[in-house]
Structure formats: C-alpha cells, structure tokens
Amino acid sequence: MTKLITTVKEMQHIVKAAKRSGTTIGFIPTMGALHDGHLTMVRESVSTNDITIVSVFVNPLQFGPNEDFDAYPRQIDKDLELVSEVGADIVFHPAVEDMYPGELGIDVKVGPLADVLEGAKRPGHFDGVVTVVNKLFNIVMPDYAYFGKKDAQQLAIVEQMVKDFNHAVEIIGIDIVREADGLAKSSRNVYLTEQERQEAVHLSKSLLLAQALYQDGERQSKVIIDRVTEYLESHISERIEEVAVYSYPQLVEQHEITGRIFISLAVKFSKARLIDNIIIGAE
C-alpha cells in the first residue's frame, strides 16, 4: 500500500535510511490531477527502482500573476489511489508552508532556455519550476527522475539544471502518452467542450504532417510552419498561439533545419490552453 508522507522532515528521514541500505530511488514530481501520462512514468520507475516516490505539490512559484493558483485542481485522495494501483511506494504531499517556510533568500534564474516558447509567455514560470525541482531533488535524493516529453522545454531545462548544479540523478524522458485518437493526455483536457475536444485532435495530426514534410526532405522551417498553421486554421476554430521550430535541447530557433529539432504547438481554447510537440531528427 502506498504511504502518504506530508512533511519534509519525515521524507528526508525515510530517504536517508533508504540510501544507507543502498536502495535505488525513482522519483516522479507532479502537481497532482494525475492521468495516464503520469502513471506511465510511475510504472517505468516501479519496474526499474527499489522505491518509487511521487510528489504531489502545487508549486506557487511557477504561477504568474494572471494564473489562478487557488483554482488548480487538487484531488489528493484520487491521486493516492491511482499511484497505489500501479505500485508507487510513497506519495510526498507537503504543505506550501513546509516547502517554503519563509521568503527565499536566493533566487534561481533560468537563462536563455526560458526566454522562448512557454517561458516567453509565462515570465518567471521556469524559475519557479527549477526552484521547486532543486528542492525536491535535495529532499528525495533520487537516483532516477522521470519527466514527460510533452513538456519538452521543461525537460530540457531540468536536464541543464542537473548538469549545472551537479545533481547525482539521471533524468529519464518519457514519451507523450496519447488518447486513442492522438490527443496528448493532459489534466487540462477536462476543460474542453465537446466541439473543442473534437477539434483538439488536430494538434497531433498537424505534427504528423510536419514529420512527414521533414521525412520527405523539407528543411526550411518556414515551409513547415506555414503548412502546419494552414492545416490548424482549417480544422480548429480557436486561437492558434504558436507554431515554432527550435533545435533540441538547445532551444534555438531554426530557419534552415540541421540536427535534432523540436516542433511546438500551442492552441488557446475557451478554458484550456493546450500544447503539443514532436522531437525529430538525428541527435
């Protein structure tokens, strides 16, 4: 049965005992409202590690002034049940006051990796992500940490953080988990109307179009962006916020494509902003 831990002190006590015995720890940091994408990461960790820890913590530092921290869905009982069914050992669910007992004396600032895509639209968001992931890594001390490729910019930033701060953890990127029709699984999908849900499937279809263009030899980003945008505009009635091509994991905007690339989409529906992406090309 999955154990619920609610304090930093108790979590650290358990981790220290596990480390002394040579136990491997797999870690999945989340903000809760779990779905199959999260559970895929939990299953991967359970199959690899002696102990799997899932954090459920809605981090206030990654919410901007126009983003409602209080409205973010919280369902700890359901989340606990879900991860228990797939074999997680511990859910770490600390209070905000325990994670941030006072004003932080040191600000962590992400560099150019946060100046594009989601980071450009949500200033300070990735500073908050890196701060909380640093704290969680120090508390949980995982051997392996699992992040979804759906948030590919976040994955690239966390990998850079691990390198820059010498964290003794290996980051495992997990492929996007999709519905049967291709829509990327997301906690935000529940906010879609019936018509929006039907239209949302075209995000993934437009990425398959981009992949086909690349495989046919197209290397001009503008051509791919224009074709994908045209497809989305003909199939989605909502606002298309972004179609972009960047190198990966460097996140440098590409004009003439060389090497590995990251094609990113963002569409604003009435009550949900959905993102999707595909990473293609040689590393």
UniProtKB/Swiss-Prot annotation:
Belongs to the pantothenate synthetase family. This is Pantothenate synthetase. The gene is panC. Keywords: ATP-binding, Cytoplasm, Ligase, Nucleotide-binding, Pantothenate biosynthesis. GO terms for biological process: pantothenate biosynthetic process. It comes from Staphylococcus aureus (strain NCTC 8325 / PS 47). The keyword Nucleotide-binding applies. Pathway: Cofactor biosynthesis; (R)-pantothenate biosynthesis; (R)-pantothenate from (R)-pantoate and beta-alanine: step 1/1. It is an enzyme of class 6 (ligase). The lineage of its organism: Bacteria, Bacillati, Bacillota, Bacilli, Bacillales.
